[in-house]
């Protein structure tokens, strides 16, 4: 199964995306929640056999250190722990400013380019806004949290993960048939019935394809909330 998803520009870009979902000041975000979502994303990439760059793994190890210290009993205040968190948040804030300036310059460049050259035509599905202002990466991040829970269930149940091959076309047909009966379904409900991680991954990719083709419509009522598939647009 060949899978290609557009990546973030780096670990700080991913962290900024996660932090921005909370709609609060960077220094007010629940840092442990953000760390868990980052780690879920990395683990899901690995399960799906997608390449993970070294800088993402380095950041993951640093975040795991912060998380582990956060979860330890607070017998003595750890100055080093506070420094690690403060340093991380300052880096995210600095990257946020850098990205804003970079985007402003890129916009100016695009405006000038219209007068001097034919604009380059590009079609990147992986970075496209699908529906309800949701991008593929928004759905993938929500999916990675679901995958983390599913992996925990399979591990607890001592489930043997077999190398089953699931055709995306078959999964697309299955989702469409289910929507014919129920009109609205949540991806979490479908995933609960899956027996292997390969099946979960195939269903997710089938859902993305159906959304892209506007065969089904996607809805997420809140950040990090359940992913809902609808037969018809609201």
From Swiss-Prot:
A Pfam family of this chain: SMC_ScpA
Function: Participates in chromosomal partition during cell division. May act via the formation of a condensin-like complex containing Smc and ScpB that pull DNA away from mid-cell into both cell halves.
Keyword set, alphabetical order: Cell cycle, Cell division, Chromosome partition, Cytoplasm
PANTHER family from the UniProt entry: SEGREGATION AND CONDENSATION PROTEIN A (PTHR33969:SF2)
Protein name: Segregation and condensation protein A
GO annotation terms (biological process): cell division; chromosome segregation; DNA replication
InterPro entries: ScpA (IPR003768)
Protein's cellular compartments: Cytoplasm
Classification via HAMAP family: ScpA
Gene Ontology cellular component annotations, sorted alphabetically: cytoplasm
First-listed, main subcellular location of the protein, grouped into a coarse class: cytoplasm
Protein source organism: Streptococcus pyogenes serotype M49 (strain NZ131)
Homology family: Belongs to the ScpA family.
Assembly mode: Component of a cohesin-like complex composed of ScpA, ScpB and the Smc homodimer, in which ScpA and ScpB bind to the head domain of Smc. The presence of the three proteins is required for the association of the complex with DNA.
């Amino acid at each position: 199964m060949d899978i290609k998803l557009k990546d973030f520009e780096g670990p700080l870009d991913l962290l900024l995306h996660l932090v921005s979902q909370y709609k609060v000041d960077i220094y007010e975000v629940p840092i442990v929640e953000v760390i868990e979502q980052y780690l879920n994303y990395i683990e899901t990439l690995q399960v799906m056999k997608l390449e993970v760059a070294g800088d993402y793994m380095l950041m993951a190890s640093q975040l795991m250190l912060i998380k582990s210290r956060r979860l330890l009993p607070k017998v003595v205040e750890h100055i080093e722990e506070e420094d690690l968190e403060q340093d991380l948040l300052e880096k995210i804030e600095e990257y946020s400013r850098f990205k804003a300036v970079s985007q402003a310059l890129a916009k100016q460049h695009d405006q000038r380019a219209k007068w001097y050259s034919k604009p380059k035509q590009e079609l990147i599905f992986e970075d496209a806004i699908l529906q309800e202002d949701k991008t593929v990466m928004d759905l993938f991040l929500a999916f990675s949290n679901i995958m983390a829970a599913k992996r925990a269930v399979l591990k607890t149940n001592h489930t043997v993960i077999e190398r089953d091959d699931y055709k995306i076309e078959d999964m697309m047909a299955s989702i469409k048939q289910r929507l014919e009966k129920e009109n609205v379904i949540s991806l979490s409900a479908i995933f609960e019935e899956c027996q292997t991680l390969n099946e979960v991954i195939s269903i997710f990719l089938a859902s993305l394809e159906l959304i892209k083709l506007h065969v089904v419509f996607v809805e997420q009522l809140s950040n990090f909330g359940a992913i809902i598939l609808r037969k018809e647009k609201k």
